[in-house]
């Protein structure tokens, strides 16, 4: 199970990295130790995570500086653990996206271009494939990462960056083997490339890709949007759009109020002229948007069936979970501290930040272990949600963590929260992070959960030390 080793940093590190092929078992053991400390003190430096031990700190730095340690081997070890976990699930989503890692300190001059040549920030571009299980959309793990530095002169590039989509597909295929038939690749508009679509279809693989280019359907001769607009409406659905600050066409910032949007759904079978590719498409388009608002519109290309309303809604639901990889990027850069690292050599920095990519996945999974009931309810699995909520909090927390959390939450537990249950633990941690549930939704934000988790962990060492002293008969 995903949660079996998740909450104990040492167990988690062992499960993810103990199979790393680093050329010497002592290096692998050191990787496990370093990863465990970085996970225990997420977002903190090696110095802080070493807990005042000079030997631990020096050992960690020696590992990070070791030229015989391959960053790619570190990433592969984590990816193969993801493959192992994936065997539990009948269907998976492979969410793909690219992000940049930006640095301005001394090492920056040896890294690649991110913006203009004049920019002081330089770094890497990283394309990631993140696996989710397709029922409750829990994060399984990282399946693949490709890192590269963009040269100042595009003519110096080894190959087109668009090749990252085909490379990710090939690596996923190799690692997943026969399980690849259970995997649906989910990509944004950048993946709307003829070679990528053709490759997925040639290998009989599944995908949902948002359309970018004004392609035409061969049979109707119409552009895809116009062709789908001519198809009968399957039905509609509503979504809630949160409040957000936006920049208008004149560059002025304004507040976009929260609203509900009604969308219509149409679908059809299409054939693209280039390569004579035949696939399915779904068009979701907002009906009667407020004056001044750009209507929501998604045109999705897919291998999945789309004949019925339920099938089309499933494709939409799959694509809406693409945002999870954006949360991974946030967890990696901010929560795990990838962009706060200050190693002075590119290779050392890459080793460190590669470890932190899996620490970031753990942060996502920690949150999801508490929010699983909400995910189950969203899929209509009410009995399953109630069953999970009623489980003991010790299924995800240690007895000491439960005891400390109970002390910190004393007098705050609501009547509907069963003492010692997972539902209570979720709400108690959220309250510790400042969640007031003023809207009576019972659903805490990412930030509140993480703040609460950090607060619990920061107090745990003192709590354990006090217990130890009391066990020795020392009054405190």
UniProtKB/Swiss-Prot annotation:
Gene3D superfamilies: Tn5 transposase, domain 1, Transferase Inhibitor Protein From Tn5, Chain, Transposase Inhibitor Protein From Tn5, Chain A, domain 1. Mediates transposition of transposon Tn5 by a 'cut and paste' mechanism. First, the monomeric transposase binds the 19 bp inverted DNA repeats flanking the transposon. Then, dimerization of the DNA-bound transposase creates a synaptic DNA complex. After nicking of the first DNA strand, excision of the transposon proceeds through a series of intermediates. The transposase then mediates the insertion of the transposon at a new site by strand transfer. The activity of the wild-type transposase is very low, and is further inhibited by dimerization with the transposase inhibitor (inh). Residues 369-476 are annotated as: Important for dimerization. Its EC number is 3.1.-.-. SUPFAM superfamilies: Ribonuclease H-like. It is an enzyme of class 3 (hydrolase). Mg(2+) 1 binds at residues 97, 188. The keyword Cytoplasm does not apply. Monomer. Homodimer of tnp (isoform 1), and heterodimer of tnp (isoform 1) and inh (isoform 2). This is Transposase for transposon Tn5. Changing residue 322 to A/K: Loss of strand transfer activity. Binds 2 magnesium ions per subunit. Keywords: DNA recombination, DNA-binding, Endonuclease, Hydrolase, Magnesium, Metal-binding, Nuclease, Plasmid, Transposable element, Transposition. The record marks 210, 298 as: Interaction with DNA. Its cofactor is Mg(2+). Belongs to the transposase 11 family. The keyword Phosphoprotein does not apply. GO terms for biological process: DNA transposition. It comes from the Bacteria. The gene is tnpA. Tn5 is a bacterial transposon that contains three genes conferring resistance to the antibiotics kanamycin/neomycin, bleomycin and streptomycin, flanked by two IS50 elements. IS50R codes for the functional transposase (isoform 1) and for the transposition inhibitor (isoform 2). IS50L differs by one nucleotide, giving rise to an ochre stop codon and producing C-terminally truncated proteins that lack transposase activity. GO terms for molecular function: DNA binding; endonuclease activity; metal ion binding; transposase activity. Mg(2+) 2 binds at residues 97, 326. Changing residue 97 to A: Loss of transposase activity.
